[in-house]
Amino acid sequence: MIQAKEELLAALGLALAELVPGSDLAPAFENPKQAAHGDLAITAAMQLARPLRKNPRELAQALVEALGRQPAAQKWVDAMELAGPGFINLRLKPAARQQVVSAVLSQREGFGVRAPNGQRVMVEFVSANPTGPLHVGHGRQAALGDAICNVFATQGWAVHREFYYNDAGVQIGTLASSTQCRLRGLKPGDAEWPASAYNGDYIADIAREFLAGATVKADDRAFTASGEVEDIDSIRQFAVAYLRHEQDLDLQAFGVRFDHYYLESGLYSSGRVEEAVAKLTAAGKTFEEGGALWLRSTDYGDDKDRVMKKSDGTYTYFVPDVAYHIHKWERGFDKVINIQGSDHHGTIARVRAGLQAAGVGVPQGWPDYVLHKMVTVMKGGEEVKISKRAGSYVTLRDLIDWTSRDAVRFFLISRKADTEFVFDVDLALKANDENPVYYVQYAHARVCSVLARYVEEHQGDLATLADADLSLLAEPTEFALMNKLAEYPEMLGAAAADLAPHNVAFYLRDLAAHYHSYYGAVRFLDGAVEPMRARMALLEATAQVLRNALAVLGVSAPRKM
């Protein structure tokens, strides 16, 4: 159907040019809302009716006639039908649907993958403060970010994955002082324990390792604890390195990798923060008031001007963010995407204002943002709010330990990022159709089981299925399954364009549903040899697309369950 659709799209363009010379309306197909309406729908007549001041149904009839004269339509279209005020529904010939099986079997992992386009995209995600274990919100961000990276890779982009460490803020001081309190024998609940201190057991772990003079590695650098309770600099450096290492272990367990870890402290040591402030001041976009330095961010759509440098000489947190994004711009990426929690929404306007004011050529609306909402964890019918390890929140490691990496990744990406998500631990453990990741993985395992029986019971050769007579695939459930397979490349393109990796999860559930319906309707291993081979070719193609799509989400495709 992919080749047929491409040829028909070109034919539709020629038909539109014949019907409306000079029109800039791009030829396009839509998927009918109901399968009974056909395989493809055209709405061009209704879009053209108002500017041309013509009846849309009459335009549709003329378009049907013009399209019908095109060789591609004669080759691939079985029938064209008018519907409603001016819809055109196309029913394709069986060969148009069947060709997707050959395409999948020939391209395998490359099905749906575009050739390199010479463009680079940078995706910044997770970017947790090195002050504690990764929480479930970081987990959602990791799942979203990794999937977006994978989706862009399928579209031919060179992908750069970046993690930004806020290792220079007030919270780092709180981490160091909390660890020092533990070193002095204090614990949460003691009268002398600071109200602002971090309470999780991980602080006690850091203190124990620090006293032992342990060495930890972060960014290929080794940090050895001095073991001195009053050595606050050593405590701070060791605690940050310890937690960065712990976060790295959590990300490894989650199957997420990064190409670069960018340190906020490096922005200060390299002079980039001062350079950014100098650019803004030289451009006349700052002013002094009350002993502080302000940015005229209202000139760029912010709701009020923002303090950049406080009266005590320290910078507010958005200033290094501006410096960081100037460096992102200078590195020459064609596209930059930030994935953050929705609580960061207020920072977008001021960062973009700073970038515009700096006068370095950054276009308006740069970079792109994906903001995700919070995750609520339910277990045993009750909300889980705390973790012994973290002290005040559920960690990513908790979720992985309670369920599985596959379940956590699939669940956290199975809804639009801008919707709140309830992670039901009990549901993630169910081995039935209620559990979406089980439902999809079981479809793959079920296909593999049938293919294994074909080899064992019928001495079938999977390597020769590409030669099967696909014209024998004529059952309604087979047509529906082939249509769904054919949607995969276009779905990936839309997921990249819309920054919507949840589309992949939705697609997987639909594809699994089509396969399960097919499984219930057809006896795969009965009957004559050639129809059986054709069915096995369709199953092999289905398994391949399930694997491809699951890989985009970073989820495994088990062959047995």
Swiss-Prot record:
Presence of the UniProt keyword Protein transport in the record: no
Enzyme class: ligase
InterPro entries xref list: aa-tRNA-synth_I_CS (IPR001412), Arg-tRNA-ligase (IPR001278), Arg-tRNA-synth_N (IPR005148), Arg-tRNA-synth_N_sf (IPR036695), ArgRS_core (IPR035684), DALR_anticod-bd (IPR008909), Rossmann-like_a/b/a_fold (IPR014729), tRNAsynth_Ia_anticodon-bd (IPR009080)
Keyword Nucleotide-binding set for record: yes
EC number(s) reported in the record: 6.1.1.19
UniProt family annotation: Belongs to the class-I aminoacyl-tRNA synthetase family.
Subunit structure, as described in the record: Monomer.
Protein name per its UniProtKB record: Arginine--tRNA ligase
Taxonomic classification: Bacteria, Pseudomonadati, Pseudomonadota, Betaproteobacteria, Burkholderiales
Gene name, Swiss-Prot/TrEMBL: argS
